[in-house]
Every structure is written in structure tokens, then in C-alpha cells.
Amino acid sequence: MTLLLELAHGLPWLYFSLVFLFSLMIGSFLNVVIHRLPIMLEREWQAEYRSYFSSDTPQPEDDERYNLMVPRSCCPRCNHPITALENIPLLSWLWLKGRCRGCQAAISARYPLVELLTALLSVVVAMTLTPGWGTLAALLLTWVLVALTFIDLDKMLLPDQLTLPLLWGGLLFNLLGGYVPLGDAVIGAMAGYLVLWSLYWAFKLLTGKEGMGYGDFKLLAALGAWLGWQALPIVLLLSSLVGAIFGIGLILLRNHHQSKPIPFGPYLAIAGWIALLWGDSITRWYLSTIL
């Protein structure tokens, strides 16, 4: 940690460059998580279903291992295995001009976008916070929020496999003297869950519809565990504001049907990340404005 401090103060350009390059690699791994984790969960649910109804349905043979490490990544169209040279974050996509080397099928621009976004957000964290354990924790939180955002956008799902470790990680970090006292973190986790849970049931009783999912409750609880209960109002306010802006924009662009649900997780993630870095400044500005 002392080396990081010396590097940040003596050679800030090198420090930020290392953060950028390392986070590009993290972004590449996040692409794997975003793509594979929902598939892994679906396979697990299907296996559980078959185990419950084994006497009624035939058991398919599926010996293929599938997790974050295996099988090796390949083109979904021609099964061309992706080599190490073709898997360099950001650069490989540019070098291949966004096409598979085997069949020339287009490779989604989402892959380099996730890598670049992860790297840029990480550099902002490094530039905003003083190098230390708090910065490393903020980077970890940022990376998990990126993965949750894109999974929710794709599948309308916030997996427990990410939200629950994030919640317990926030409590553990604050137990060790992190951002807020442990008591504030515990209250933040409880209040974060209960606030959205209450809104969910109030909305359902009034309209008969579900306004959000339980994953949203757990994500706000996790943010409360990291940032404390004091950050919850600003997180809720910012997430509602960001959600309104994106929702209105999609409707105006006619790129979204009003009956189609919009995931709330990405807006919570964006608001939580903003509150992590600038929550105190926003609160002070707001209070000084109205008082």
C-alpha cells in the first residue's frame, strides 16, 4: 500500500495508467461473468427442476462442464476457439475490426464497451479517492456494479451470487474500519431492503402489478451495507432521477414500449456509484441550497 501511495504522488500518470490497464483485464473477465453467470443459473434451475420431477421427465445426459473458466471461449457461430492474441482487452476487437477471425461474423461492440467502461470508471475512482484500502474496496464495488448492471439489462435479473456477497462484503469492510461505522452499515442494509420491499408491496396492492424484483431490494441493501443508512436517501433520489431520464429518453426515441418493464438495478448501481464518490458533497450542496 505504501508503494501505491508513493506511485500515486510521485508518478500519478503511471499510477492511473496501471489502474486503467489492470481494469481493462477486469472488464474482460466481467464480460465472461455477464454472459455465463445467467446461463449457469439457468442450467442449475433446470437441474433442480429435473430432480424434483425425475419420475415424470426423462433425464438428459449433460456431462459438459460449464462455469466461468470452462469451456474455452469460442465464436457462437463457427465455434472458432478464441486465442490469447484474440482476447486482448479492447485491442483485439479493434485489430479484428469487430469480426470473428474464423467466420468473419460480427462481434458485439458491447464487449469492448464493458472493458472500456470498467477501465474509465476505475480511473475515476483512483483519481477521486486517496490510494489505500478504501480505494481498492471502491474498485471492487465498482466492478461488481458493472456486472450487475449489464446482467440486469440483459436478463432482468440481479443474481444472489453477486448481490449477497456484495452485501456481506460491505458489512465486513466496515467491520474492519471502512467507510462508515458498523452500526450504520447494518442499519443501512436493513433499511435498504425494507424501503424497497415496502414500496414493492404498496405498489402491488394498489395496482396488482410488480414494480420491481427482489434483487433490487438486495442491491439497495448491499449499497446500504457499504455506504451506511445516511447514503440511502441520495441513492434513492439519484436512481429515480436517472431512471426517469433514461425512461423518458427511450419513450421519446420510440425505442421502448410502455408495457415492457425497465430494469431498476442499473439505476441503483449508477446512483450507488455516484454516492460512493460524491455522496457527501452532493448532500452538503443540497443542504446548503435549501437552508
Swiss-Prot record:
Q: Which domain of life is it from?
A: Bacteria
What GO terms are given for molecular function? aspartic-type endopeptidase activity; metal ion binding; methyltransferase activity
Q: How is the cofactor bound?
A: Zinc is required for the N-terminal methylation of the mature pilin, but not for signal peptide cleavage.
One GO biological-process annotation of the entry reads:
methylation
Protein's cellular compartments: Cell inner membrane
Q: Which Gene3D superfamilies match?
A: 1.20.120.1220
Query: Mind telling me which InterPro entries this protein's record contains?
Result: Peptidase_A24A_bac (IPR014032), Prepilin_IV_endopep_pep (IPR000045), Prepilin_pept_A24_N (IPR010627), Prepilin_peptidase/N-MTase (IPR050882)
Q: Which reaction does it catalyse?
A: Typically cleaves a -Gly-|-Phe- bond to release an N-terminal, basic peptide of 5-8 residues from type IV prepilin, and then N-methylates the new N-terminal amino group, the methyl donor being S-adenosyl-L-methionine
According to its UniProt record, the EC number is 3.4.23.43, 2.1.1.-
- Necessary cofactors: Zn(2+)
What cellular component terms from Gene Ontology apply here?
A: plasma membrane
Q: Which UniProt keywords apply?
A: Cell inner membrane, Cell membrane, Hydrolase, Membrane, Metal-binding, Methyltransferase, Multifunctional enzyme, Protease, S-adenosyl-L-methionine, Transferase, Transmembrane, Transmembrane helix, Zinc
**Function recorded in the entry:** Plays an essential role in type IV pili and type II pseudopili formation by proteolytically removing the leader sequence from substrate proteins and subsequently monomethylating the alpha-amino group of the newly exposed N-terminal phenylalanine.
Name under which the protein is recorded: Prepilin leader peptidase/N-methyltransferase
To which species is this protein native? Answer: Aeromonas salmonicida (strain A449)
